[in-house]
């Protein structure tokens, strides 16, 4: 498409190879690992598969006379980045907007006493009644629910996109600015 999402998604695929959109996958994991609050990224290696999916889609859906048929995509269908932190933790970050598959954020946090996976959210903790099977989060929400979500979660679900995530992020930014608190954005640029 030459309008809307078609342009901003297509042009980077023509010019770049790598993870074109790392924030959704890396942001939540970096927050859980206290990146820039006790740990930091130290080493990264990244590689992409070959590009095939967009070319195949274009060849099946774009008229032979359309100038877009001459475009050559550079971004591989799947990019995988491995990141090592100063404390020895590892992160695997993947980006794939081409392959046919159900939506998943593929977030997984694994430690010595359990594992959390997201989308759909599920958890397995050492010694839990379910044994070595995934369990839902409902049993843990009352004890570990974010005070911010408790306060504005219903409003966020009603007014915000992505299940309330967009609203919560904007609400938290405004709260930090009003109260003079440090935001993640300030941390990234070294203060304001």
Model-derived segments and spans:
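Aromatic-acidic/polar surface patches that form glycan- and anion
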Residues: 14-22, 37, 72-74, 159-166, ...
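Short, mixed charged/polar active-site loops
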Residues: 90-92, 115
């Amino acid at each position: 498409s030459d309008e809307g999402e078609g342009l901003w998604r297509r042009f980077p695929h023509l010019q770049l190879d790598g993870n074109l959109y790392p924030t959704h996958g890396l942001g939540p994991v970096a927050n859980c690992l206290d990146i820039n609050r006790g740990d930091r990224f130290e080493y990264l290696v990244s590689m992409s598969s070959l590009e095939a999916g967009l070319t195949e889609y274009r060849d099946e859906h774009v008229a032979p006379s359309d100038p877009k048929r001459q475009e050559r995509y550079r971004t591989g269908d799947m990019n995988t980045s491995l990141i090592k932190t100063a404390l020895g933790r590892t992160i695997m970050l993947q980006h794939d907007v081409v392959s046919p598959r159900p939506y998943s954020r593929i977030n997984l946090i694994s430690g010595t006493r359990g594992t959390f996976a997201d989308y759909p959210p599920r958890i397995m903790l050492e010694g839990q009644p379910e044994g070595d099977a995934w369990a839902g989060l409902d049993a843990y929400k009352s004890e570990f629910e974010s005070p911010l979500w408790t306060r504005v979660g219903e409003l966020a679900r009603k007014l915000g996109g992505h299940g309330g995530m967009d609203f919560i992020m904007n609400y938290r930014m405004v709260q930090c600015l009003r109260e003079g608190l440090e935001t993640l954005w300030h941390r990234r640029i070294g203060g304001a």
